[in-house]
């Protein structure tokens, strides 16, 4: 975000006087206590995506592959390498001051929003959510929704005046507080919890959450990027997707933070199945695999716009 006032003067979202509206406001009050209100000024693109005939098992396979390859999206489309000093006031950081200005940045950063300065917390860092299936995923979230967290217990549900501080003192107040790069989703009924909807009726679509706003696009994202995402997500769905492991989950978090903070650093290596591999090499291999899918989409829709989107990504990777 741009210049901000002091944290306590940033207003909390208000959603009316209904029970649902009040719960939304209390949830955001809780986010303010947990992460600071400045965090709620962060914006990004959420891209919802589905295909007919795809079941929960297939969506989770897609999600596992997406998480493995998300570094490519951060590298290509990350657009938050710098920020206003007010955003990190009172927080530890290793940002540098931009020459001739007041902005702070990291020289090779791609997306500070998706790094350690974004929606991250000591509490959520303890979560190692597996995406091997709906039940395991749901069990992980249920644990976070019911596990008390000492720092949040200290805040309490209500303040001395009786007003709500937060919805709960557990690690997560509600499911939406878990900030992953991608989520399995289901349209919910009025009053229904997202986790209940997923367990009862399965995954209906996925929500991609790591895309930064493109400052050069009026609506924050361009048509070419959307076409690339469609090709990328189809590749994630169609490719072999072995189960994840605790070791791989740790690797993926490492890769995300490294790419967010240092993704454009020449010679940067990521971790893949316990081995160090150059980001550029891995990224080039992945983009090469997208070509046939782009060609099939263009064959179905006419033109060559999907192939051009992949070619543009390949050019950006090498630039």
Model-derived segments and spans:
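Core structural elements
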Residues: 200-204
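Histidine-centered divalent-metal-coordination microenvironment in nucleic-acid enzymes
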Residues: 39-52, 205-212
């Amino acid at each position: 975000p741009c210049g901000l006032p002091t944290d306590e003067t940033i207003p909390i979202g208000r959603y009316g006087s209904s029970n649902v509206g009040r719960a939304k406001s209390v949830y955001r009050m809780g986010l303010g206590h947990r992460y600071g209100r400045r965090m709620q000024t962060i914006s990004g693109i959420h891209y919802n995506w589905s295909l007919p005939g795809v079941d929960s098992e297939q969506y989770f396979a897609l999600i596992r592959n997406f998480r493995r390859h998300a570094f490519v999206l951060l590298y290509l489309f990350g657009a938050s390498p710098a920020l206003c000093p007010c955003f990190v006031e009172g927080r530890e950081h290793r940002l540098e001051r931009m020459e001739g200005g007041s902005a702070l940045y990291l020289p090779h950063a791609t997306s500070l929003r998706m790094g350690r300065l974004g929606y991250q917390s000591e509490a959520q860092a303890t979560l190692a959510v597996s995406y091997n299936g709906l039940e395991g995923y749901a069990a992980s979230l249920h644990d976070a929704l019911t596990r008390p967290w000492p720092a949040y217990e200290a805040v309490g549900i209500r303040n001395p005046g009786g007003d709500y501080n937060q919805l709960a003192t557990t690690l997560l107040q509600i499911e939406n507080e878990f900030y992953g790069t991608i989520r399995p989703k289901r349209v919910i009924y009025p009053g229904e919890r997202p986790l209940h909807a997923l367990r009862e009726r399965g995954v209906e679509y996925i929500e991609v959450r790591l895309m930064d706003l493109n400052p050069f696009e009026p609506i924050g994202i361009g048509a070419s990027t959307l076409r690339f995402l469609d090709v990328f997500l189809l590749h994630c769905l169609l490719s072999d997707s072995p189960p994840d492991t605790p070791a791989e989950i740790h690797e993926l978090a490492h890769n995300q933070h490294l790419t967010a903070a240092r993704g454009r650093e020449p010679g940067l290596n990521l971790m893949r199945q316990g081995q160090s591999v150059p980001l550029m090499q891995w990224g080039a291999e992945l983009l090469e695999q997208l070509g046939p899918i782009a060609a099939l989409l263009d064959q179905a829709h006419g033109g060559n716009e999907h192939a051009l989107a992949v070619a543009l990504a390949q050019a950006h990777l090498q630039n």
